[in-house]
Curated annotation (Swiss-Prot):
Record key words, sorted: Cytoplasm, Magnesium, Metal-binding, Nucleotidyltransferase, RNA-binding, Transferase
Listed cofactors: Mg(2+)
Subcellular location: Cytoplasm
Gene3D superfamilies: GHMP Kinase, N-terminal domain, K Homology domain, type 1, Nucleic acid-binding proteins
Any one of the GO CC terms: cytosol
Sequence positions that bind Mg(2+): 493, 499
All residue ranges annotated as the KH domain in the record: 560-619
Name used for this protein in its record: Polyribonucleotide nucleotidyltransferase
EC number, as in UniProt: 2.7.7.8
Recorded catalytic activity of this chain's protein: RNA(n+1) + phosphate = RNA(n) + a ribonucleoside 5'-diphosphate
Family listed: Belongs to the polyribonucleotide nucleotidyltransferase family.
Record gene name: pnp
UniProt keyword annotation of Nucleotidyltransferase present: yes
Record-annotated S1 motif domain positions: 629-697
Length: 715
């Protein structure tokens, strides 16, 4: 009899066979599931603490997605030859898994939960993110933790006007859509996508298609739980302290209402802090008078937050003005300025209300492309977008340093929005880096980065296919009443039921991200929300187009200029030289950057046009073929008894035989030639070994014949 209580479930999912397995590996974790999708194998584990830490007032969920290089049959690079800090892809996938799981834990559950997913084996054609999300959901489901799942997930492509479920990597490359959707049986919870200017209807259709197709995975997880699940935890939320809620409401309700009449964020924040402090102080007075212990600040803070949420939500649903005085459809005032920084290649300052992004575009060469060492193989990225939000953007102090998960996620969203509207590498050979510095933030800073990024790229002279704008939307739902909010503030983001960000052009959507916190948001509600988002996007695009009609036709004087020439691929080694000696000398002496691709395309870049011209000339000389009948100005390298070695082109010499110097007989070659002397010669013969024979007298004879033909006949 086996020591394992192993349970396996298999199902067909689109074009792939999926296997779920629990009970054999990682048995001391609260839950563990292995997912195998056509040889892409992940191990998802969950551990939940049995009790919350004292004073804990938030849900401490961490999700770590870790790729092991052995899964692709590789040994890690670097001195230590082991995996180091998570890559950007691992961080983004961790966020992707976290987002649909987090809202499914019950309110008041503050026990620490850690989800760890290891990628154990990789089929290069099957991305591991969807198996990882399915595995995390299944591990939580079998663990018995209080979790309102399971969650299913699916990737959807759009090829030849048809949706494709869980496409291979090759299919993703051919698709005009890469969309990931996750949700429960009844509701969509998360959408992440990149698209090539598709309509809202196509995008929503992909979400609905993915949600329908993921049901088979949810059913399989239910079966796995029935046979291999652990007993459900006997966890109950702490009973609500009704007397405390009543007293806090009595003390703070009117002051909170007054605070939310203040339209300025800083003034409102100051007033709210005062209300929180005054309420806590009054409760301590009450407790002191009664001889009891006052409720801790975290508990009081949670009650106050709930009151705030009710105030803001009811005002909006009742048609009253929003926190900053706007109605539900109005976009905040927009100010645009380009060419802000004098010595950068392109820059823009985009301000929308109290959110502001200073965005800078830099142009580089092929050598500046980012090399990504992924499990499926190494590849290069010519477009990079980095998002930074320092603490001063929200008027706070805090840590400044390497980017946090949120910054990496926002940067990727902005990149997704812009990448489909960039010119191809053939049209515009530069590598491009965009950096968005958030200088003020009150909601929707990632979408400000999209708008500012597009404007900075145009300022840098990048011929964008179209203007790209982004807008953040919110949604509040109570029973049958709902309100869609255009261009949400930070406070509205926290207090709403759904926030979603849509970026695109006049023609269609380039990126859509949705995070839904509740069940019950229907396709019809999403349709209304997307239509309102389009209205807001068109308004912003109008502002952007009136400020900047198109890309600058001239690059910045500080940007590198580039020329491209094609050489015979067999000559690449001649340009590079032994140990890189030739190309190193070329770049140092001409002040250029030179990149050579395997197909013989040479890109020369420099801010100095003379240096580029010199580098081009020298490369052409190095790679030129010696042709019979061609005349060259050469340098005598060495004198021999029977002739001279003459250098014609870099690395290409020929023999000028003693009999080919002049017409008369030459007794001593030193009477005619010296080492270092410039001499004009004609190529009279080459052989299959590359040997070249030269003649100087042939040119003398040609000159004599020409002068003779020019002499008029005598009478």
């Amino acid at each position: 009899m086996s020591m394992f209580n192993k349970v396996v479930k298999e199902f067909q999912w689109g074009q792939h066979k999926v296997r779920l397995e629990t009970g054999e590996v990682a048995r001391q974790a609260s839950g563990a599931v292995i997912v195998d999708v056509e040889d892409t194998v992940v191990l998802a584990t969950v551990v939940g603490a049995k009790s919350a830490k004292p004073g804990q007032d938030f849900f401490p969920l961490t999700v770590d997605y870790l790729e092991k290089t052995y899964s692709a049959g590789k040994i890690p690079g670097g001195f230590f030859r082991r995996e180091g800090r998570p890559s950007e892809h691992e961080t983004l996938t961790s966020r992707l898994i976290d987002r649909p799981l987090r809202p499914l834990f019950p309110e008041g559950f503050y026990n620490e939960v850690q989800v760890v997913i290891h990628v154990l084996s990789v089929n290069p054609e099957i991305p591991a993110d969807i198996p990882a999300l399915i595995g995390a959901s299944a591990a939580l489901a079998v663990s018995g933790l209080p979790f309102n799942g399971p969650v299913g997930a699916a990737r959807v492509a759009y090829i030849d006007n048809a949706y494709v479920l869980n496409p291979t990597r090759d299919q993703i490359k051919a698709s005009s859509l890469d969309l990931v959707v996750a949700g429960t049986e009844r509701a969509v919870l998360m959408v992440e996508s990149e698209a090539d200017q598709l309509s809202e209807d196509v995008m929503l259709g992909a979400v609905v298609f993915g949600h329908e197709q993921m049901q088979v995975a949810i059913d399989a997880i239910h079966e796995l739980v029935r046979e291999g699940g652990k007993p459900e935890w006997d966890w109950q939320p702490a009973p609500k302290n009704e007397p405390l809620i009543a007293r806090v409401t009595e003390l703070a309700q009117n002051d909170l209402l007054a605070a939310y009449q203040l339209r300025d964020k800083q003034a409102r924040s100051t007033k709210l802090k005062e209300v929180y402090a005054a309420t806590s102080a009054k409760l301590e007075e009450d407790a002191s008078a009664a001889g009891t212990v006052a409720a801790d600040k975290a508990t009081v803070g949670n009650v106050l937050f709930d009151i705030e949420a009710k105030i803001v939500r009811s005002q909006i649903l009742n048609g009253e003005p929003r926190i900053d005085g706007r109605d539900t459809r109005t976009v905040r005032p927009i100010e645009i300025r380009t060419g802000v920084l004098p010595r950068t290649h392109g820059s823009a300052l985009f301000t929308r209300g109290e959110t502001q992004a200073l965005v800078v575009a830099t142009l580089g060469t092929k050598g500046d492309e980012q090399i990504i060492d992924a499990l499926e193989g190494e590849y290069r990225e010519r477009f990079m977008l980095h998002y930074n939000m320092p603490p001063f953007a929200t008027g706070e102090t805090g840590r400044v340093g390497s980017p946090k998960r949120r910054e990496i996620g926002h940067g990727r969203l902005a990149k997704r929005a812009l990448v489909k509207c960039l010119p191809s590498a053939d049209e515009f050979g530069y590598s491009i880096r965009v950096v968005s510095e958030i200088t003020e933030s009150n909601g929707s800073s990632s979408m400000a980065s999209v708008c500012g990024g597009c404007l900075a790229l145009m300022d840098a002279g990048v011929p964008m296919k179209a203007h790209v704008a982004g807008i953040a939307m919110g949604l509040i739902l109570e029973g049958n009443k709902f309100a869609v909010l255009t261009d949400i503030l930070g406070d509205e983001d926290h207090l709403g039921d759904m926030d979603f960000k849509v970026a695109g052009t006049e023609q269609g959507v380039t990126a859509l991200q949705m995070d839904i916190k509740i069940q019950g948001i229907t396709k019809e509600i999403m349709q209304v929300a997307l239509a309102q988002a389009k209205e807001g996007r068109m308004h912003i695009l109008g502002k952007m187009t009136s400020a900047v009609s198109g890309a600058n036709t001239q690059l910045s004087e500080f940007a590198p200029r580039m020329i491209t020439i094609k050489i015979n691929p067999e000559k690449i080694r001649d340009v590079i030289g032994k140990g890189g000696s030739v190309i190193r000398a070329l770049t140092e002496e001409t002040g250029t950057t030179i990149d050579i691709s395997d197909d013989g395309v040479v890109t020369i870049a420099s801010t100095n046009s003379d240096g580029m011209a010199e580098a081009k000339k020298r490369i052409e000389n190095i790679t030129a073929e010696i042709e019979v009948g061609q005349v060259y100005e050469g340098t005598v390298l060495k004198l021999l008894d029977f002739g001279a070695i003459v250098n014609l082109l870099p690395g290409k010499d020929g023999l000028l035989h003693i009999s080919e110097i002049v017409n008369e007989r030459v007794k001593d070659i030193n009477d005619y030639l010296k080492e270092g002397q410039q001499v004009k010669v004609k190529v009279i013969q080459t052989d299959e070994k590359g040997r070249v024979r030269l003649s100087a007298k042939a040119l003398l004879n040609e000159a004599a014949a020409a002068s003779q033909s020019d002499t008029p006949p005598q009478q």
